[in-house]
């Protein structure tokens, strides 16, 4: 059992024995390593789930930042408990004055809240528009109720003041409801990010369940844990506080064990298997009898404790739930009923769920969700969709970006595919590839729109290139960055072709579960009230997208010509050697 130490100040790398850490959770592991090194050390560690090679496991750093998709099991298979990194030098900046100017410009004119929502969720004196679904939730009368020194009001936060940007997003209340307000200490987030999207709560009662009273997370990890209760979580003192308390218990356990939820699919799979009688069918009678299903029905948080322990330590047949959706479908013979069940939200028969798919700009989100090998983790399009601006403005922006207002459909009022939607899909995918490459957050970027009426709510899509030049000193345009992103995305596609050993991406990879087409049977496709898709239209959509990318229009795999255009001649040669290039 080893720890990898990297001390960047001396560019020193060493492997150290970690026997004394094996069996510990991610939190205790991090604390021990920081005692041995420095409080400034950043530790990425696995918990018991990774040690036990649980497929749905991850590595955790900074308490709750998860690298999922089985990375924990990979580290565990190598007996690698943690990677510890310490650095003392600053980041080299070619033009600090320009960097500061761009930062001020972004902070005062462009940036919104989480997901770059640019209007508040409630009507406010400074705002022309509001949208109750916006994550710009700051308002008068909404407080960080458990803040040190007393409650702090979020208040009205008009754009322009950099020091108040961090108040705009209030994820604990957004994710968990009003009952979370009195337990919220503050919002936090990734290092140096002005958008504070991470909940930080303090709930003394949580200690009764053997976990720290403090903690937090964001998005699905914030609220998913109590969704397994068929009758909802049991309240303690106040209405809906069971959801808040139960989820803090759940996320503290989940992150400490180093489990990964597959964007909530683990919990949906549990609900499916419980409600459909699968567990009763596949679990040995003795195991089924010892599980406290009465606690589940009662919404008792103790059930979560037992459930997560079983998953992380691979106890019994139930623990195979954490093998992933594809594996349990095979192991437990779940069949088409499972894959076609709309509430289960499985996008692909490979076992990953929707992530802003058909419900997010129709064919655009659908294409995006077909392109990766797990939930797609692409927010370029959903940030634009959820900005909070009125439909008329969004369609105007879409015309400027993609050539036609028809690129942008009203949610659940879709139209057939067109060329502008294909450009929208390509833009969404290339931007996420770019952001991943230059380490920008695709949960905020790109700056497509702005909160300022004086800018007519237009953002600045060249900002990535401007920052790139200021930081590196290298001449850069957005067109060059887009080309680099296209190279990255095409390389990813080529690698998928190689790993799957097939050119036929359309029929072997870009697959969609049946419920996406069969839901809402009483509502015709392309009429108001449904976000279902049409099979023929999606076939045409993929063909058009393949052509736009320079891939084979029938197979959906990169051509030699496109690989050469992108400077990937070696990749073309490798694919050709394996008979994986189209004729």
Predicted regions, residues:
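Well-ordered mid-protein domain cores that form the structural environment of catalytic cofactors
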Residues: 1-40
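Extended C-terminal regions of large enzymes
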Residues: 34-583
């Amino acid at each position: 059992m080893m720890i990898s130490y990297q001390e960047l100040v001396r560019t020193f790398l060493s492997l150290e024995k970690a026997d004394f850490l094996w069996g510990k959770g991610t939190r205790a592991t991090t604390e021990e390593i920081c005692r041995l090194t420095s409080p400034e050390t950043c530790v990425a560690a696995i918990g018991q789930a990774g040690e036990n090679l649980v497929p749905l496991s991850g590595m955790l750093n900074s308490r709750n930042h998860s690298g999922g998709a089985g990375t924990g099991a990979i580290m565990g298979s190598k007996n690698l408990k943690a990677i510890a990194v310490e650095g003392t030098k600053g980041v080299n900046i070619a033009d600090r004055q320009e960097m500061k100017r761009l930062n001020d410009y972004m902070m005062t004119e462009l940036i919104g809240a989480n997901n770059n929502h640019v209007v508040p969720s409630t009507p406010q004196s400074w705002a022309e528009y509001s949208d109750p679904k916006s994550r710009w939730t700051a308002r008068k009368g909404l407080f960080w109720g458990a803040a040190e020194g007393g409650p702090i009001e979020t208040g009205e936060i008009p754009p322009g003041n950099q020091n108040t940007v961090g108040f705009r997003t209030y994820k604990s209340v957004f994710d968990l409801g009003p009952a979370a307000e009195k337990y919220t200490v503050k919002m936090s987030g990734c290092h140096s990010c002005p958008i504070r999207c991470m909940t930080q709560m303090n709930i003394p009662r949580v200690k009764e369940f053997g976990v720290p009273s403090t903690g937090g997370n964001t998005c699905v990890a914030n609220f998913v844990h109590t969704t397994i209760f068929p009758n909802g979580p049991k309240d303690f003192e106040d209405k809906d506080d069971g959801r808040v308390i139960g989820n803090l218990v759940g996320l503290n356990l989940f992150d400490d064990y180093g489990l990964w939820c597959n964007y909530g699919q683990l919990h949906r799979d549990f609900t499916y298997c419980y409600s459909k009688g699968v567990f009763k069918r596949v679990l040995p009678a003795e195991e089924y009898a010892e599980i406290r299903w009465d606690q589940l029905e009662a919404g008792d948080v103790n059930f979560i404790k037992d459930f997560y322990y079983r998953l992380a330590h691979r106890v019994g047949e139930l623990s195979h739930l954490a093998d992933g959706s594809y594996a349990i479908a095979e192991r437990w013979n779940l069949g088409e009923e499972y894959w076609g069940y709309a509430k289960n939200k499985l996008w692909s028969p490979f076992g990953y769920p929707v992530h802003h798919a058909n419900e997010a700009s129709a064919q655009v989100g659908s294409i995006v969700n077909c392109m990766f090998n797990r939930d797609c983790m692409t927010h370029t399009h959903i940030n634009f969709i959820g900005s909070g601006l009125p439909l008329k403005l969004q369609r105007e922006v879409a015309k400027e970006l993609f050539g036609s207002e028809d690129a942008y459909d009203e949610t659940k009022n879709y139209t057939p595919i067109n060329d502008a939607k294909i450009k929208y899909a390509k833009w969404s995918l290339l931007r996420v590839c770019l952001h991943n490459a230059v380490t920008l957050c695709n949960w905020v970027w790109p700056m497509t729109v702005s909160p300022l009426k004086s800018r007519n709510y237009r953002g600045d899509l060249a900002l990535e290139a401007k920052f790139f030049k200021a930081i590196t000193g290298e001449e850069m345009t957005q067109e060059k960055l887009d080309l680099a992103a296209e190279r990255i995305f095409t390389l990813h596609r080529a690698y998928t072709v190689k790993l799957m050993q097939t050119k036929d991406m359309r029929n072997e990879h870009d697959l969609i579960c049946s419920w996406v087409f069969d839901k809402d049977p009483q509502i015709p496709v392309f009429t108001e009230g449904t976000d279902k898709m049409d099979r023929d239209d999606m076939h045409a959509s993929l063909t058009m997208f393949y052509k736009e990318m320079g891939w084979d229009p029938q197979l959906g795999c990169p051509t030699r010509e496109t690989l050469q255009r992108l400077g990937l001649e070696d990749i073309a040669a490798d694919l050709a050697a394996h008979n994986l290039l189209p004729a």
